[in-house]
C-alpha cells in the first residue's frame, strides 16, 4: 500500500512542494527569505483580519476606530502593532530576497523572476493603501500626493485621478475603496505566490555556486524545514522586540494627528520602505519625468535577465561584480536616507547623484564589468 502522503490528491501536492522536494545541498541562509515571506504573508492576513473586525472605513470614524482598537480591544494594541511592524519585516525580507536573486543570478529563471516582480508591485500597492487606512495626517497627505502623480499621465491623467478618488479630492469614497482593495489584495498575492512556487518547482532552486546541482540533492524535509523554522524563530524574536519595546520606531509621529485637509504637514514622506523610490521621484524636477523614474526604478528589475552578460551565473566567483553589487546596496541606503530628508541643499544634489548612480550601475556598469570578467577568464 502506498503512503497516503504520496497518493492522496491534495496531500500529494504538499508532499511534492515541502517534504519530498529535492533541494540543493549547499543553499545558504539567503534562501530562507522565501519561507519567511510566506510566514509574513500569513501573519499579515491573520492580524489584518482581526483588525478589520473592529475597523470602520469612514472618514469620521476611521481614526477613532484605530484608537479604539489600541485602547479597548483585548490585545488590540498587539494586533495593530504586529500588523504595522509586520509590514516592515515583510519589506526587509522582500529586499533581501530580491538582493539574493540579483547576487546569485536567480533571475535567469525568467518565469519565477517576472511573477516575483509583479508580486513586488502588488505588495507595494497593498502597503500603500494600508498606510492610508488609519486616516492620520500622513495617511491623508500621502494618499493625496501619490495618487496625484497619476495626473502626470498625458491626456487621461486628471480624469484618472478623479476616478480613483471617487470625487474631487481624497475623501470618504477613497478611504472606502482603499479598504476594499487592501482587504482583497493579500488573497490575490497568495494566489500569485502559488504561481511563483509553481514556476520555481519547474526548474528547482538555484544555489550559491550558480551551477547545476542535480547531482547533489537532499530532501527538503527534514533539512530545510528545520532551517526554515530557525529562520522563523529569529524573525519572531525581531518582530516581537520591535512590537513590545519600540512599536513606533518605524512610523511617523504625524500619523497620530487626525487627517486635516486644511493643514499640510511640513514634510510629507511615505513609510521607510518606499523612501528610496520617493527620493528617485523627487530628484527629477519634472512631474512626468519623476513618475517615470519612480516606475522604472522598480521595473528595471525586469531587465536583469536581459542585461546578464557574464559566462557565470552567480557573483560568488566574480569579485568586481561583487563590489558593484555592494555599491548598489550602499547607494540604495543613501537614497532611503535622502527620501526622508527635506527638499533643500545639500540633500537635493545628493539625491540626484544617487539616482543617476542607481540607474548607471544597473544599466551600464554591471553588464560591462561582467564582460570584462569574461575577458579576464582567458588570462
Swiss-Prot record:
Q: Where in the cell is it found?
A: Mitochondrion inner membrane
Binding locations of a ubiquinone: 201
Q: Which PANTHER family does this one have? A: CYTOCHROME B
- Binding residue positions for heme b b562: 83, 182
Family designation: Belongs to the cytochrome b family.
Q: What is the lineage of its organism?
A: Eukaryota, Metazoa, Chordata, Craniata, Vertebrata
Query: What is written in the cofactor note of this entry?
Result: Binds 2 heme b groups non-covalently.
| Subunit organization | The cytochrome bc1 complex contains 11 subunits: 3 respiratory subunits (MT-CYB, CYC1 and UQCRFS1), 2 core proteins (UQCRC1 and UQCRC2) and 6 low-molecular weight proteins (UQCRH/QCR6, UQCRB/QCR7, UQCRQ/QCR8, UQCR10/QCR9, UQCR11/QCR10 and a cleavage product of UQCRFS1). This cytochrome bc1 complex then forms a dimer.
- Write out the residues that bind heme b b566: 97, 196
What name appears for this protein in its UniProt entry?
A: Cytochrome b
Q: List the GO terms this entry assigns under cellular component, sorted alphabetically.
A: mitochondrial inner membrane; respiratory chain complex III
Q: Which cofactor does it need?
A: heme b
One Gene Ontology molecular-function label: ubiquinol-cytochrome-c reductase activity
In the bilayer, the protein is annotated as: Multi-pass membrane protein
In this UniProt entry, which cysteines form S-S bonds?
A: none
Reported function: Component of the ubiquinol-cytochrome c reductase complex (complex III or cytochrome b-c1 complex) that is part of the mitochondrial respiratory chain. The b-c1 complex mediates electron transfer from ubiquinol to cytochrome c. Contributes to the generation of a proton gradient across the mitochondrial membrane that is then used for ATP synthesis.
Q: Which UniProt keywords apply?
A: Electron transport, Heme, Iron, Membrane, Metal-binding, Mitochondrion, Mitochondrion inner membrane, Respiratory chain, Transmembrane, Transmembrane helix, Transport, Ubiquinone
Which biological process terms from the Gene Ontology are attached to this UniProt entry? mitochondrial electron transport, ubiquinol to cytochrome c
Please, what other remarks does the record include?
Answer: Heme 1 (or BL or b562) is low-potential and absorbs at about 562 nm, and heme 2 (or BH or b566) is high-potential and absorbs at about 566 nm.
Q: Which organism is it from?
A: Ctenomys tucumanus
Amino acid at each position: 500500500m502506498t503512503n497516503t502522503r504520496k497518493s492522496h490528491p491534495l496531500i500529494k501536492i504538499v508532499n511534492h512542494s515541502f517534504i519530498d522536494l529535492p533541494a540543493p545541498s549547499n543553499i545558504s541562509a539567503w534562501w530562507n527569505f522565501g519561507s519567511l515571506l510566506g510566514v509574513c504573508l500569513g501573519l499579515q492576513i491573520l492580524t489584518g483580519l482581526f483588525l478589520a473586525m473592529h475597523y470602520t472605513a469612514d472618514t469620521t470614524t476611521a481614526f477613532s476606530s484605530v484608537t479604539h482598537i489600541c485602547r479597548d480591544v483585548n490585545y488590540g494594541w498587539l494586533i495593530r502593532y504586529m500588523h504595522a511592524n509586520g509590514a516592515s519585516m515583510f519589506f526587509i525580507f522582500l529586499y533581501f530576497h530580491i538582493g539574493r536573486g540579483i547576487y546569485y543570478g536567480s533571475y535567469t529563471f525568467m518565469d519565477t523572476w517576472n511573477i516575483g516582480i509583479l508580486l513586488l508591485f502588488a505588495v507595494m500597492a497593498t502597503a500603500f493603501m494600508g498606510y492610508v487606512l488609519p486616516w492620520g495626517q500622513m495617511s491623508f497627505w500621502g494618499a493625496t500626493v501619490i495618487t496625484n502623480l497619476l495626473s502626470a499621465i498625458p491626456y487621461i491623467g486628471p480624469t484618472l485621478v478623479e476616478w480613483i478618488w471617487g470625487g474631487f479630492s481624497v475623501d470618504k469614497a477613497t478611504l472606502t475603496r482603499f479598504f476594499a482593495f487592501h482587504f482583497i489584495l493579500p488573497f490575490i498575492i497568495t494566489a500569485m505566490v502559488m504561481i511563483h512556487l509553481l514556476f520555481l518547482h519547474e526548474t528547482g532552486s538555484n544555489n550559491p555556486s550558480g551551477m547545476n546541482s542535480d547531482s547533489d540533492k537532499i530532501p527538503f524535509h527534514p533539512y530545510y524545514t528545520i532551517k526554515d523554522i530557525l529562520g522563523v524563530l529569529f524573525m519572531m524574536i525581531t518582530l516581537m522586540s520591535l512590537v513590545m519595546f519600540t512599536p513606533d520606531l518605524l512610523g511617523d509621529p504625524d500619523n497620530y494627528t487626525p487627517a486635516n485637509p486644511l493643514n499640510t504637514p511640513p514634510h510629507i514622506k511615505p513609510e521607510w520602505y518606499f523612501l528610496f523610490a520617493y527620493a528617485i521621484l523627487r530628484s527629477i524636477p519634472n512631474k512626468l519625468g519623476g513618475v517615470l523614474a519612480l516606475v522604472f526604478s522598480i521595473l528595471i528589475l525586469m531587465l536583469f535577465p536581459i542585461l546578464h552578460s557574464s559566462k557565470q551565473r552567480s557573483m560568488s566567483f566574480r569579485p568586481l561584480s561583487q563590489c558593484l553589487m555592494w555599491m548598489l546596496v550602499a547607494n540604495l541606503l543613501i537614497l532611503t536616507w535622502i527620501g526622508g530628508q527635506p527638499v533643500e541643499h545639500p540633500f537635493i544634489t545628493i539625491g540626484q547623484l544617487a539616482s543617476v548612480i542607481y540607474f548607471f550601475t544597473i544599466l551600464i556598469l554591471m553588464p560591462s564589468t561582467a564582460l570584462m570578467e569574461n575577458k579576464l577568464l582567458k588570462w
